[in-house]
UniProtKB/Swiss-Prot annotation:
Belongs to the bacterial ribosomal protein bS6 family. One of its GO terms (molecular function) is small ribosomal subunit rRNA binding. This is Small ribosomal subunit protein bS6. The gene is rpsF. Binds together with bS18 to 16S ribosomal RNA. One of its GO terms (cellular component) is cytosolic small ribosomal subunit.
Amino acid sequence: MRHYEICFIVHPDQSEQVPGMVERYRAIVTAKGGSIHRLEDWGRRQLAYPIQKIHKAHYVLMNIECDGDTLNELEHSFKFNDAVLRHLTVKMKAAVTTPSPMMKEEKSKSMMPGDAAPAAPAETAAA
């Protein structure tokens, strides 16, 4: 079995459907003996360029191990799902389980203590 990294972008109106979609894709992979090494939900983010007059979309990243038939079935389900705006599959040499740079960036932003401190004086000044 080979290792793949898959990133897909979901229409923002369908953001609440993402967990169900991920479970469906997880079932496709695991049904044929594959495994998911990393699954990251990046949430709603700004697109680099508009797709179908949409400027924001929901991003999901998966690192999986599967055979060619499973990958074809997965990509087929991406193509015929109207909620998936774009998808990209990259073949990897080994399984990737570490957090992606996007998640590291999000985690560092959320852990910065400086974010909470400036917000408090601004609120007190307004009151």
